[in-house]
Amino acid sequence: MTHMHITSWVIALILVFVAYGLYSSGNSKGAKITHMILRLFYIIVIITGAQLFLKFTAWNGEYIAKALLGLITIGFMEMLLIRRKNGKAATGIWIGFIVVLLLTVVLGLRLPLGFKVF
């Protein structure tokens, strides 16, 4: 399940950048299709993350923080695309997205189901 979760959020990250680029280039039809596929991957990421979260019986604060950071990351992904679609500035959203994404990945790798990088 861990590999499915990681694969789904990596694909979701790729789709965010593709959709952002399509919105930036003015290709609204392609961007809309990519955005809808990305929303499907949001659901897959949330479901696989919930399964990993519920796998343990003894939770601590790190598991809850990882789950919340994951949901916030998905929120930032969606805000980035909506702001780009509407032509609004997204600099602050980009900074928040990168910070929260890095925190989420580092915390995910630190937990027992993550890869032993740290």
From Swiss-Prot:
The keyword Lipid biosynthesis appears for this protein: no
Annotated keywords: Cell membrane, Membrane, Transmembrane, Transmembrane helix
Residue ranges of the TM segments: 6-26, 33-53, 62-82, 89-109
Gene Ontology CC: one annotated term: plasma membrane
Subcellular localization: Cell membrane
Record's protein name: UPF0344 protein BLi01172/BL01343
Organism name: Bacillus licheniformis (strain ATCC 14580 / DSM 13 / JCM 2505 / CCUG 7422 / NBRC 12200 / NCIMB 9375 / NCTC 10341 / NRRL NRS-1264 / Gibson 46)
Presence of the UniProt keyword Membrane in the record: yes
Family to which the UniProt record says this protein belongs: Belongs to the UPF0344 family.
Membrane-protein topology: Multi-pass membrane protein
Pfam families associated with the record: DUF1516 (PF07457)
